[in-house]
């Protein structure tokens, strides 16, 4: 069945007549150019005014990561525009990032993301990692798993993205920090590249893992550090 499980279900647990009523099924875009049957195995990240300071909207902004390597944002708020007077609607969703996943490179996102808001910057960061959880011991030099962090530059607003642009550039908007032990290559702080080049790569970071390593559980953000469980 094409697109098995590639949907976000909005369920009403407070409906007294029909408890657990499905209010909406939001189909997630299935990239036909990829050789992966898409699915959403992880728990969504849900941002509400109850859990986050400074939020003015009612409802929630929701984020999911999927098998195809996409990071998707959903508008479940009462906002009616994107801050630039462009109209938005309830249940709108847009792809923020594509990490170029394939069967060959094994970049499956089995596990949920963790998220946090910078104390000073107020930026929302989402953290995820990849690895075929059903074949943890499988080794192949073609495997190219990663762990990464991505910054939603529009938060706390919802802005529709050009998905053709997102799919085309993939991780090019993020900084490769694989061999960086000092932080010099991190987004917004790197001084190895020009200001123009830095601006093009300031939406996130990623670390390439050796072919023998896979992320085996969801990451954990604590006190400004992100911890990734790695199977080797």
What is each PLM-predicted segment?
Residues 1-232:
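Beta-propeller fold recognition
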């Amino acid at each position: 069945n094409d697109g098995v499980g590639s949907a976000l279900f909005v369920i009403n647990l407070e409906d007294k007549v029909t408890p657990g009523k499905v209010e909406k099924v939001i189909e997630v875009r299935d990239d036909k150019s990829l050789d992966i049957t898409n699915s959403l195995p992880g728990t969504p990240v849900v941002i509400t005014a109850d859990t986050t300071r400074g939020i003015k909207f009612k409802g929630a902004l929701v984020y999911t990561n999927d098998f195809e390597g996409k990071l998707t944002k959903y508008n479940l708020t009462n906002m009616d525009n994107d801050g630039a007077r462009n109209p938005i609607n309830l249940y709108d969703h847009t792809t923020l990032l594509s990490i170029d996943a394939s069967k060959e490179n094994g970049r499956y996102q089995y596990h949920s993301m963790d998220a946090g808001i910078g104390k000073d910057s107020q930026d929302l960061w989402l953290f995820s990692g990849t690895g075929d959880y059903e074949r943890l011991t499988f080794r192949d030099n073609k495997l190219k798993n990663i762990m990464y962090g991505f910054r939603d530059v529009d938060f706390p607003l919802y802005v529709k993205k050009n998905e053709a642009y997102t799919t085309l550039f993939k991780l090019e908007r993020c900084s490769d920090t694989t061999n960086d032990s000092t932080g010099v290559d991190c987004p917004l702080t790197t001084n190895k590249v020009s200001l123009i080049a830095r601006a093009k790569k300031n939406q996130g970071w990623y670390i390439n893992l050796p072919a023998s390593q896979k992320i085996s559980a969801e990451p954990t953000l604590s006190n400004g550090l992100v911890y990734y469980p790695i199977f080797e």
